[in-house]
Structure formats: structure tokens, C-alpha cells
């Protein structure tokens, strides 16, 4: 997925799932499955339920995404 094609949206982590997956409720009301980006995994950034996150969505599958940023 090229960086230019990704759709960036914000949401809130609802629940953690196995294999570093999370259920995220987006600000527009949709709920998606998201995994942690490689840089966040590399630097051991912890994501807990209730955290505000930025998610990149692929234009091909809007039900799955990649968490790229956790707000402080």
C-alpha cells in the first residue's frame, strides 16, 4: 500500500485482540480491525483500551487498518 493511497482517520481503541490486533471505533462510527505498524512494534509502544489512535485504511478494504500513531 503506497503512502499516498492510504486514508488516515482517527479513532478509539475498544478492545485488544490476539496477535497485536485491536478493534478500533472510528470517529465516524464505524468499527474496524487494526494491527500495529512495524515502527510501533519495534519501539514497544503500548496500546491500551481507551487510547486515541491514528489509523491508515486501505482504499481496497475499509474494514482493516494499521495503527500508525498513539496520542499522548
From Swiss-Prot:
Major localization listed first in the record, in broad terms: cytoplasm
Location of this chain's protein in the cell: Cytoplasm
MF annotations from Gene Ontology: ribosome binding; rRNA binding; translation initiation factor activity
CDD domains hit by this protein: S1_IF1 (cd04451)
S1-like domain residues: 1-72
Pfam families, sorted: eIF-1a
Keyword Protein biosynthesis (UniProt): yes
Cross-referenced PROSITE patterns: S1_IF1_TYPE
Gene3D superfamilies, A to Z: Nucleic acid-binding proteins
Classification via HAMAP family: IF_1
Record's subunit section: Component of the 30S ribosomal translation pre-initiation complex which assembles on the 30S ribosome in the order IF-2 and IF-3, IF-1 and N-formylmethionyl-tRNA(fMet); mRNA recruitment can occur at any time during PIC assembly.
The protein's name: Translation initiation factor IF-1
Gene name as annotated: infA
